[in-house]
Each structure stands twice: as C-alpha cells, then as structure tokens.
Regions:
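Conserved N-terminal ligand/cofactor-binding loop architecture of enzyme catalytic domains
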Residues: 1-53
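Acidic donor-binding loop of glycosyltransferase active sites
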Residues: 224-234
C-alpha cells in the first residue's frame, strides 16, 4: 500500500513529493513526534503478534516506517529483538532522529556530522555503506554479459533507467541520447521498470531502434553490459551502480533525498550530475566516453563504495548476538 502511494506520487507529481519532503524537514524542528510516528503506533501490536509467532534474533530495517514501529514497541514496554536501521539514502531523512533502533548503519563516514546534527548518538552510528547483493556478475566480462542478455557483444550500449517507476522526463532523455547514439555508433537500452505507459510510447516511437526493457531481475547484467549508466539518483540503485563500477550520470532527481544523493555522488566524484538534460546531458555522455574520465570516476567508486558493506553488516549482526 505504502509503495503504491509513493510510486504513484513520484510518477505523477514529483514536485508535490518534494513539497511534502520539505514539510518533513520543517516539521522535524518541532519538539514533538511526527504524524509518521503516531500512524505507525497502530502497527506495534501487529508486529508484536508476528514476532511471537515468528521469533527473530535481530531485526534489520532499511525503511523508516518499521523503525518507527520498533520505537513505539519499545516505548510501550514490549519486548523487541536487537534492531538495526540501515539508511539507504545519502542523507539523514526527516524523522530518522525520532527512531530508537539499537544501531544505525549509514552510507559513509562523511555523513556522520549530518546524523549527529539531528541527534543520533555517535556510538550508534556505523558508516559501513549501503549493502548490495553479490550477484557474481562482477566476475564475468562485459562481452559475456551482453551475450547472456542477447545483445551484440561487439556493440557499445548506453543504459538508461528511471528506477522501478520510471521518470517523467525520460522520454526527453531518450530523444537526446538517441541523437548522441547516432553520432557515436552505440545503442540505447531503456529500462522502463513498471512504467507500462512509458514503455508503450517509446515502443511506438522508436520500435527496434533502441532496446526496450520492462521490469527485469537482470539489472546486474545490464550494469555489466553498459558503457555508461544514466539514471535517477536513488540511494540503493546508485550504490548498486557504483558497486558495478560503471560510469554514472544522474538525472531527474525527485526533490528531497534524491537531490541529496545526487549532491553526494557529484561531490565524491562517483557520478556526474545533470540538472538540465537539454543543455548538459550530451556533454556529460561525451565526457565519460573519454577513458581518463571513466577511469577517474571508477576509482572514486572503488574508494567510497568498496563493496564490503554486506559482510560488515553481517559481522555487526553476529557481534550483537553475542
């Protein structure tokens, strides 16, 4: 239910989502709990009943809402297993500070001052990074990834995605990149996710001139096959891209946490930030077709997303059980 509301909101009116996010930023300055906290209070009894039937050694939550439920349970005197909140954006999102998980895993040590600013105790903060799955794809060549996807191993591909819901400006982005493609002998792969309307419109306009993909569970292969990845700056999806060591261009951020993700990746050199695709996107693509720029960006990705977060989170869980 929450996912559907979120996806519908950002698909149809990302500006409204940005306004709601800014309201959250303002509300967090007030000296009392947020409506989000009180709404999730009703879920405390449901989670308590679930845990009685399905005992757990530890709860790991990458989302604010379960963290709010756990906080309510603690304040209501309910028994709760050790809990770990994993922040999946490169920012301390509104109301994180009112949660009371035992540990808080954050994407980078560079974000410690921001989380401390909002009152998260330093001893709770673990800058381990955002965990990503080991898919095994990193051990195959780009050519093999292309073959497994039914693509031409000899061709270069520009990979575009808008997250699971697509993004409003993606048609414009495809049009811009299609012109770049025609100049540089590469082909576009457009991952539309669950946005069937976008898929249909692009299929009608471009037919077989670009590779169109709907929802897919083969994103790691596409990241391996692509030469450059153009996408919205989601926290987890951008981390997965950086872990795949693919040159990255951020576009069309949803105002709020995605804007902050874009800023972090730009500042650390892990991605280029394009705020005006018409004026900036072509130059960004051409820049990342230069080998020295690609190499420099991948080195930054290796520095800030070393790929150790999942193992370190597992170690933190084991230590907490002792």
């Amino acid at each position: 239910m929450i996912d559907k509301v979120y996806i519908g909101l950002v698909q149809k009116n990302s500006t409204l989502f940005g306004f709601v996010y800014r309201l959250g930023e303002l509300y967090r300055r007030l000296p009392f709990p947020s409506p989000v906290y009180y709404i999730n209070r009703k879920m405390a009894y449901i989670l308590q009943e679930y845990l009685l039937r399905h005992p757990a050694d530890v709860i790991i939550t990458p989302h604010l809402y379960p963290a709010e439920i756990i906080t309510n349970m603690k304040k209501m005197g309910m028994e709760v297993p050790p809990s770990i909140f994993v922040a999946t954006d490169y920012a301390c999102i509104p109301f994180t500070e009112e949660t009371d998980c035992d540990d808080v895993v954050i994407p980078s040590e560079k974000l410690i001052p921001e989380f401390r600013k909002y009152g998260i105790p330093k001893e709770k903060l673990y800058p381990l990074g955002i965990p990503t799955a080991d898919t095994g794809v990193e051990r195959i060549s780009p050519e093999e990834a292309k073959r497994q996807l039914g693509l031409d191993p000899a061709k270069e591909y520009l990979l575009i995605a808008g997250g699971s819901m697509g993004a409003g400006a993606l048609e414009e982005v495809v049009e811009i990149l299609y012109r770049v493609r025609s100049l540089h002998k590469c082909k576009l792969i457009m991952v539309c996710g669950n946005n069937q309307q976008l898929y249909s419109r692009l299929q009608k306009r471009y037919a077989d001139k670009i590779e169109l993909v709907g929802y897919t569970d083969k994103m790691p292969l596409y990241l391996k096959a692509g030469s450059i990845f153009i996408t919205k700056p989601g926290g987890l999806s951008s981390t997965e891209a950086a872990a795949a060591r693919i040159p990255l261009i951020h576009i069309c951020p949803i105002p709020g946490c995605e804007t902050k993700n874009m800023q972090f990746f730009k500042k650390t050199g892990m991605a280029l930030a394009v705020t005006n695709p018409k004026e900036e996107l072509t130059a960004a693509v051409l820049s990342l077709q230069k080998q020295e720029n690609r190499k420099k960006m991948i080195q930054c990705q290796e520095k800030y997303v070393p790929g150790t977060a999942t193992a370190q989170l597992g170690q933190l869980v084991e230590e907490g059980k002792k």
